[in-house]
Amino acid sequence: MAESKNNKKRCSFCGRSENEVGFLITGMNGYICDSCATQAYEITQEAMGAGKQSAGATRLNLKELPKPVEIKNFLDQYVIGQDDAKRFLAVSVYNHYKRLLQKDSGDDVEIEKSNIIMVGSTGTGKTLLARTIAKLLHVPFTIVDATVLTEAGYVGEDIESILTRLLQVADYNVPEAEQGIVFIDEIDKIARKGDNPSITRDVSGEGVQQGLLKLLEGSVVNVPPQGGRKHPDQKMIPVNTKNILFICGGAFDGIEKKIAQRLNTHVVGYNASRKTATIDKNNMMQYIAPQDLKSFGLIPEIIGRLPVLTYLNPLDRNALRAILTEPKNSIIKQYIKLFEMDGVKLTFQPEVYEYIVDKAVEYKLGARGLRSIVETIMMDVMFEIPSEDQKEYEVTLDYAKHQLEKANLARLQTA
């Protein structure tokens, strides 16, 4: 308690005695005078007002909403190829946020949410596309791995943990989080294991799909603020998922067989040979349809709540070569920037680029593998250069080969 030697009560903030102020408010371990209480109230109101203003400043504006062509052009700066997927994403994202900003016209026409599912091999750019769109729109964005999700009551993460991560990214600003984007990766890993029910519980398959339904369709979900399992003493935060855009991605390994079976069934009969001749058997993914996802193991309710289905082409050698150097944030440009920060000009022999791409193709690593290869090549020089008085450094083909031969290539193959 703030008391003087003569037992006079004093304000714990300004130190004035009870005779020098209008009145004192008694707390558990001290006092506060009327003047300090007024100042504290004004400071609190000012801080809360600034918070609301900053939160409102990040909200989307229909006039500032980028058009589909502008969205695609922005994606082109960071992602090589995949034009079809970019067009699907650009239109879907534009319509989604236009739907959020629509005014009540009173005509009873309600535009439904268009969640997206992207199908493509590992390293083709699914995650990068979603992340780049969130960067353009300046909305909260989070990535969730579907493989760690389990039904409530089992070891693993609850479905609600998806929204916990989005809230954390938005600094617990609920209105802002409710306009965010969630990317659910490896959605194919929660496919139903088979058509026949098993005596063992499929806690990370169909049960998780059922749990995702309420998030995808739009409902108010009580979210534990710190994640983890719910318990009675934990205060929940209600989050409305109606305006959250969900983008799902998965490799769907083996789905080409499902597509081929469907196409073979459909082309049997009159004029079948002509139709079969037009099918590109090297890229069956381009013919994917919702029924193929159902055959793979996604339940119809989930497929219905992911109405926008697009695919990503496998990356050929030319695409990998472009990805290595052309995007704004390409791995080569990142290393050049890192060396610049140490005052060193970094260059590569042109043959090094071709060698890196050859290895990525050889080990079937995709675009993600390019980084693994470059980091393996550059590790030693990145360790030594900051301690040396050197202004220029050129990576030669011989040096690149030596570094990769010295490394454990089997480790790269599973990167």
UniProtKB/Swiss-Prot annotation:
ATP binds at S121, T122, G123, T124, G125, K126, T127, L128. One of its GO terms (cellular component) is HslUV protease complex. GO terms for molecular function: ATP binding; ATP hydrolysis activity; ATP-dependent protein folding chaperone; protein dimerization activity; unfolded protein binding; zinc ion binding. Zn(2+) binds at C11, C14, C33, C36. SMART domains: AAA, ClpB_D2-small, zf-C4_ClpX. Pfam families: AAA_2 (PF07724), ClpB_D2-small (PF10431), zf-C4_ClpX (PF06689). One of its GO terms (biological process) is proteolysis involved in protein catabolic process. Keywords: ATP-binding, Chaperone, Metal-binding, Nucleotide-binding, Zinc. Gene3D superfamilies: 1.10.8.60, ClpX chaperone, C4-type zinc finger domain, P-loop containing nucleotide triphosphate hydrolases. It comes from the Bacteria. Residues 1-52 form the ClpX-type ZB domain. PROSITE patterns: CLPX_ZB. ATP-dependent specificity component of the Clp protease. It directs the protease to specific substrates. Can perform chaperone functions in the absence of ClpP. Component of the ClpX-ClpP complex. Forms a hexameric ring that, in the presence of ATP, binds to fourteen ClpP subunits assembled into a disk-like structure with a central cavity, resembling the structure of eukaryotic proteasomes. Belongs to the ClpX chaperone family. HAMAP family: ClpX. This is ATP-dependent Clp protease ATP-binding subunit ClpX. It comes from Bacteroides fragilis (strain ATCC 25285 / DSM 2151 / CCUG 4856 / JCM 11019 / LMG 10263 / NCTC 9343 / Onslow / VPI 2553 / EN-2).
